[in-house]
Amino acid sequence: MDVLSPGQGNNTTSPPAPFETGGNTTGISDVTVSYQVITSLLLGTLIFCAVLGNACVVAAIALERSLQNVANYLIGSLAVTDLMVSVLVLPMAALYQVLNKWTLGQVTCDLFIALDVLCCTSSILHLCAIALDRYWAITDPIDYVNKRTPRRAAALISLTWLIGFLISIPPMLGWRTPEDRSDPDACTISKDHGYTIYSTFGAFYIPLLLMLVLYGRIFRAARFRIRKTVKKVEKTGADTRHGASPAPQPKKSVNGESGSRNWRLGVESKAGGALCANGAVRQGDDGAALEVIEVHRVGNSKEHLPLPSEAGPTPCAPASFERKNERNAEAKRKMALARERKTVKTLGIIMGTFILCWLPFFIVALVLPFCESSCHMPTLLGAIINWLGYSNSLLNPVIYAYFNKDFQNAFKKIIKCKFCRQ
């Protein structure tokens, strides 16, 4: 959003830079060629990478069937929105930045501001929609499977655009101050105090609060599940050390398949190990008592499960079996803790990037209209803040897609042109 225009917040005659206020009389001739070249290269690279990154995400979802699910539809819609920012908004913003003045006329300025606010607001609200979808998926996984439909995704996407439209249109209908159009060389968003509060809270502060709450609850739910798994693993290890093997869990088969199965149980004796018949336990060569049942699934496969013996305090499992279970329990505990660290890292990257890109911009956008006569915005700082917000459209596909292995595989296919051959 181009709330901070070249020249805003600075009425001095200091050397021109991207962010001096309206009323600034500097023209194209006052901007050095080196500034124009360097700025053009930097902003051109940012725009090119943003277009390429978001286009690849859209192409990956369109071409790879495994990526066509509700969660990725939201990511794809975010990529389309950021692609619109990159194609419709950033080129005009870059031209404005390089020339240090608006040269495209008032009508184009109004259209530019409306597109800017609409697309950037929709992009931010897409992040809320993704957070909401993830929150429902992790806190209500059973019921949400049936509710997580393309229709629901379409409703969330439509809502992001509706809110963006309601925030971007009012200035075109007159919710602005007369001073907003007083300088033909400047193109800024409405500085009306009421609209400033309405737009900044609707486009950023309320979505930010919502995302903090949602991701906070997602983290707590994920941590609860992970630590529950750790406790279960530790209990399993303790039971093994005290001579009790964990009973098979319902709805889980020996060979890892899920769902209900018909089982047939029979006792089998194995030479050199635990010798069992008709529920009686005999001592094996290693001195350990181990009852072994043979589990036959209706089909061809069979497995042998050690069960706790009822023949006194003799350990159920050989020492090697116990050590193996302890190693497995420790490995599972480490994996669970690693998942928790990964969850913290992922959520930190998502929220950290969003806040880093947009918070400085919206602080200035909220404060500046209320103290325009007394506030001074350094020109270079203003440019950095403005383009830091725009750069979120470049970083979104990296965070939400490129770290995903399924997307990585699809990108490799695109690069190798496998879809072309298909």
Swiss-Prot record:
Effect upon mutating residue 405 to A: Reduced activation of G proteins
Binding positions for 1D-myo-inositol 4-phosphate per the UniProt entry: 314, 345-346, 352, 403-405
Motif extent (NPxxY motif): 396-400
GO CC field: dendrite; plasma membrane; synapse
Membrane-spanning intervals of the chain: 39-59, 74-98, 108-132, 153-174, 194-216, 347-370, 379-403
Binding residues annotated for serotonin, in chain numbering: 116, 120
Disulfide feature: 109-187
Residues spanned by motif DRY motif: 133-135
GO terms of molecular function: G protein-coupled serotonin receptor activity; Gi/o-coupled serotonin receptor activity; neurotransmitter receptor activity; receptor-receptor interaction; serotonin binding; serotonin receptor activity
Primary location class: membrane
Residue span of region Disordered: 1-23, 235-262
Membrane protein topology class: Multi-pass membrane protein
Family matches, as PROSITE patterns: G_PROTEIN_RECEP_F1_1, G_PROTEIN_RECEP_F1_2
Compartmental location: Cell membrane; Cell projection, Dendrite
Pfam families the UniProt entry points to: 7tm_1 (PF00001)
Reported effect, residue 345 to A: Reduced activation of G proteins
Task of the protein: G-protein coupled receptor for 5-hydroxytryptamine (serotonin). Also functions as a receptor for various drugs and psychoactive substances. Ligand binding causes a conformation change that triggers signaling via guanine nucleotide-binding proteins (G proteins) and modulates the activity of downstream effectors, such as adenylate cyclase.
Disease: Periodic fever, menstrual cycle-dependent: A condition characterized by recurrent fevers up to 40 degrees Celsius associated with the luteal phase of the menstrual cycle. Women show menstrual cycle-dependent physiologic changes in relation to sex hormone levels. Because ovulation triggers a significant change in the hormonal milieu that is similar to local inflammation, a 0.5 to 1.0 degree Celsius increase in basal body temperature after ovulation is commonly associated with progesterone secretion and is believed to be triggered by the induction of several inflammatory cytokines.
Name of protein: 5-hydroxytryptamine receptor 1A
Organismal lineage: Eukaryota, Metazoa, Chordata, Craniata, Vertebrata
Encoding gene (name): HTR1A
